[in-house]
């Protein structure tokens, strides 16, 4: 040990003690460890008694090296204290009562401390060598099957191992299929282990342990994807593990078992995969991927519900409050996904930091949400077509447009992810530019300028003193009236209670408009340098979305009357009354120009038409009929391109679930360019749901499915906050890894943990009160109830099923896996662009680049 620099030992980095490979002593140590006395004591040079080491191992219950390392990782002089205590133990001490005795060398000066560090290093080095030597000699660790085989009174031939819950369910299902198919039952033993083996070696024990103790089983897929590794070799190792696990299950039954055949097929399918997703997305790609999903039907169509129930200021306030809650959620989870940017997405991180069943339910709930969002985007594109009365929109034409819009999203998602990113970027930047232009357009029209010179509108529709007849202006609607059909909203709940309910309703409505901002986390597995990309993309995305929403809502809110019956109603049961009000012109006398006319198809009022968009209504108010028609066509483009983001999130969620062994492994299959085409194709099959828009009688049922999609998003946001809080408190207990205050910490979100608590409480309220109007007298609707709480029901069913059939449990904070994925990213070097002040032109260019 004299060759080791003693000063270097004072700054350890492995389990608090620096370990170095002693190649010069490897042969001597191995040969020394091979000597065995009759009493089991081994004499080793360096005055270390391995008999004492063995007694420490037995006392601590260290069956393998992993348990040993986990026990000593947070204690600097653990072995020194234990060894000294054992060595100084006398007969008198053994006969005395059990009291904790501490035998330590007092730390008096620098040299004493250095000696203790060196002594601890020697003990740990010997212990490591001891474990390695016993592994080479096949130290057998008997499993439950082997113990009962040797020591059961019934003997090894008659004993049948009891089944756990998972095995019982599989056994029942196996017997059912066996009876149906006429397969003879030849059961040897009920065991998941190989009955031909007496026990398992240390290596096999580690393999089995890693698949049960680690929550996120996808250790391979949790690595940094761009890390320079031999993919073929690593996949060979994974397949070898799968084959070993399969061999254990195949030994259960001599005859055929359908369930075991299915498991064998799944294991073989994993062996065929050669490629995985690749990091090709830049900041601007990820940014526009989320923006493209947000700037769609949620803002430009369903915002009409908010205006009709809460008025202009209530709508603005509700959108702002919802934005603050979601901002807290995004900033919190950004910190977690930046430190550990794994390809399993937020489902995998939720499994790791909350519970396996929680991550399972969260992942499948989000997949259901995205799966329903795709046909919702496609069908809403066809709904806008009803605006054009001179176009014959037959069922065949509608089906053709649905096919066209669906095929567009599918083809784009099957392209190389970098090409898809460029397409999404062009579409997203176009949406941002159009949104900015519409803000200026609304302000110019409000000031009295436009096609024809007209009087300025100002804040006329915000001033309750300017109300006339049945036109009730004001910051809020006069009352919280769910049954208002253009009569002025005078029969509902008035006062502060009514305004509170109106604002709360807008907050629930706006969750659909903000759905999609979480897509930056799904793309973390395909982001170039995620520790820089994800925080930047998240902050830019939400800044653009929130600021754009506020200005868009404000600018259109000053140009429309919130009581116009052409806007979508919050309660769908009054669609017929609103249609009659439109025919009579009730609530439409506020318009400055009435030259924009057209037929209205009553059958489509319940789901919204081109007339229902507040921006189209505002343009018609100023007599800009051609402009209104053109913008309605732009809205078709907005919703059609949003389908790309919906299918992307749907396919990547399915891929992540497969990576975690929570979905069939076939969904892991990727093309050579890193596209999970099996997940894309399977997810796209559900776009056929959009064809129910062809049949007008089924539109109401489709509206229920769309509401399930939007309501489920709040559950996802709630899960993101909960995952971060568990991570936050677990990180505070791990003193041996990076701290949040460290300068090298990738991203530190502000005001924690209060920010995450605020987001968790807000999102939980969204989930609980999503369907509260159903409990108001005379407004119960079974379909509306299930559309509001259907996602929550699915989440609890998934969670309970996985909890019952699996082995999921909530881990203690000190047992959470804080290393998988993080350490690989720590070892990855990214090439960063040099940053400098530059000229004014370069600064301006940099500002524009940061925004878009």
From Swiss-Prot:
User: Keywords, A to Z?
Assistant: Cell membrane, Membrane, Transmembrane, Transmembrane helix
Segments in the Extracellular topological domain: 307-329, 379-400, 444-500, 562-623, 695-703, 777-784
Under the cellular component aspect of Gene Ontology, which terms does the record hold? endoplasmic reticulum; membrane; plasma membrane
**GO term, biological process aspect, one:** amino acid transmembrane transport
The subunit structure is: Component of the plasma membrane SPS (SSY1-PTR3-SSY5) amino acid sensor complex. Interacts directly with PTR3 and SSY5. Interacts with YCK1.
Family per record = Belongs to the amino acid-polyamine-organocation (APC) superfamily.
Name of the protein: SPS-sensor component SSY1
Q: Identify the species of origin.
A: Saccharomyces cerevisiae (strain ATCC 204508 / S288c) (Baker's yeast)
């Amino acid at each position: 040990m004299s060759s080791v620099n003693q000063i270097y030992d004072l700054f350890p980095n492995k389990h608090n003690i620096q370990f170095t490979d002693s190649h010069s002593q490897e042969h001597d140590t191995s040969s020394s460890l091979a000597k065995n006395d009759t009493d089991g004591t081994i004499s080793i040079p360096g005055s270390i008694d391995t008999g004492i080491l063995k007694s420490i191992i037995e006392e601590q219950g260290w069956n393998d090296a992993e348990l040993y390392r986990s026990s000593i990782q947070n204690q600097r002089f653990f072995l020194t204290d234990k060894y000294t205590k054992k060595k100084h133990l006398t007969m008198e001490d053994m006969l005395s009562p059990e009291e904790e005795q501490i035998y330590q060398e007092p730390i008096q000066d620098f040299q004493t401390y250095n000696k203790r560090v060196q002594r601890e290093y020697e003990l740990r080095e010997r212990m490591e060598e001891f474990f390695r030597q016993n592994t080479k000699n096949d130290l057998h660790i008997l499993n439950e099957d082997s113990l009962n085989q040797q020591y059961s009174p019934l003997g090894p031939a008659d004993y049948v191992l009891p089944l756990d819950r998972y095995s019982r369910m599989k056994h029942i299902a196996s017997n059912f299929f066996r009876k149906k198919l006429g397969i003879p039952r030849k059961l040897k033993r009920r065991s998941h282990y190989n009955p031909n083996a007496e026990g398992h070696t240390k290596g096999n024990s580690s393999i089995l342990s890693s698949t049960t103790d680690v929550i996120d089983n996808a250790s391979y897929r949790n690595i940094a994807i761009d890390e320079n590794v031999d993919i073929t070799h690593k996949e060979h190792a994974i397949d070898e593990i799968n084959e070993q696990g399969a061999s254990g299950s195949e030994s259960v039954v001599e005859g055929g078992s359908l369930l075991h055949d299915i498991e064998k097929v799944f294991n073989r399918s994993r062996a065929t995969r050669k490629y995985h997703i690749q990091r090709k997305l830049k900041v601007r790609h990820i940014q526009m991927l989320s923006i493209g999903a947000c700037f769609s039907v949620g803002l430009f169509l369903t915002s009409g519900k908010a205006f009709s129930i809460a008025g202009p200021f209530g709508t603005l306030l509700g959108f702002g409050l919802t934005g603050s809650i979601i901002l807290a959620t995004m900033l919190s989870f950004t910190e977690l996904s930046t430190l550990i940017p794994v390809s399993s997405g937020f489902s995998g991180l939720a499994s790791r930091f909350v519970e396996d069943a929680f991550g399972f339910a969260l992942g499948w709930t989000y997949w259901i949400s995205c799966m329903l969002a795709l046909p919702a985007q496609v069908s809403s594109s066809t709904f806008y077509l009803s605006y054009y009365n001179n176009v014959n929109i037959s069922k065949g034409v509608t089906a053709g447009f649905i096919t066209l819009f669906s095929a567009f999203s599918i083809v784009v998602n099957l392209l190389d992810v970098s090409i898809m990113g460029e397409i999404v970027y062009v579409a997203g930047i176009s949406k941002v530019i159009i949104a900015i232009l519409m803000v200026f357009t609304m302000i110019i029209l409000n000031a009295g300028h436009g096609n024809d010179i007209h009087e300025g509108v100002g804040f006329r529709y915000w001033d309750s003193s300017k109300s006339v007849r049945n036109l009730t202006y004001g910051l809020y609607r006069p009352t919280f009236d769910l049954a208002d059909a253009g009569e002025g909203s005078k029969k509902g709940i008035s006062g502060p209670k009514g305004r509170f309910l109106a604002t709360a309703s807008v907050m629930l409505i706006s969750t659909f408009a903000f759905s999609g901002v979480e897509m930056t986390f799904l793309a973390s597995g395909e982001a170039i340098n995620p520790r820089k990309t994800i925080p930047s993309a998240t902050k830019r995305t939400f800044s653009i979305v929130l600021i754009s929403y506020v200005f868009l809502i404000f600018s259109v809110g000053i140009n429309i009357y919130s009581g116009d019956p052409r806007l979508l109603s919050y309660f769908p049961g009054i669609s017929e009354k609103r249609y009659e009000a439109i025919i009579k012109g009730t609530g439409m006398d506020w318009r400055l120009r009435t030259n924009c006319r057209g037929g209205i198809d009553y059958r489509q009022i319940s789901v919204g038409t081109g007339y229902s968009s507040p921006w189209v209504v505002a343009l018609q108010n100023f007599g800009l009929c051609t402009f209104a028609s053109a913008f309605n066509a732009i809205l078709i483009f907005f919703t059609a391109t949003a389908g790309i983001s919906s299918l992307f999130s749907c396919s990547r969620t399915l891929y992540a679930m497969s990576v975690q062994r929570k979905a069939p492994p076939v969904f892991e299959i990727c093309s050579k360019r890193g596209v999970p085409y099996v997940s894309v194709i399977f997810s796209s099959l559900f776009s056929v749901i959009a064809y129910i828009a062809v049949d007008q009688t089924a539109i109401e049922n489709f509206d229920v499915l769309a509401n399930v999609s939007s309501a489920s998003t709040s559950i996802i946001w709630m899960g993101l906050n909960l995952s971060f809080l568990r991570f936050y408190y677990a990180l505070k207990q791990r003193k041996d890894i990076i701290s949040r205050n460290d300068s090298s910490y990738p991203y530190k979100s502000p005001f924690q943990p209060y920010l995450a608590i605020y987001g968790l409480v807000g999102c939980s309220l969204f989930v609980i009160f999503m369907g509260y109007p159903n409990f108001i007298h005379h407004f119960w609707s079974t379909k509306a109830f299930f559309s509001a709480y259907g996602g929550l029901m699915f989440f609890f069913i998934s969670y309970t099923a996985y909890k019952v059939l699996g082995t999921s449990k909530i881990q203690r904070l000190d047992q959470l896996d804080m290393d998988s994925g993080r350490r690989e990213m720590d070892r990855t070097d990214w090439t960063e662009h040099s940053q400098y002040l530059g000229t004014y032109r370069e600064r301006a260019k940099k500002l524009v680049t940061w925004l878009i």
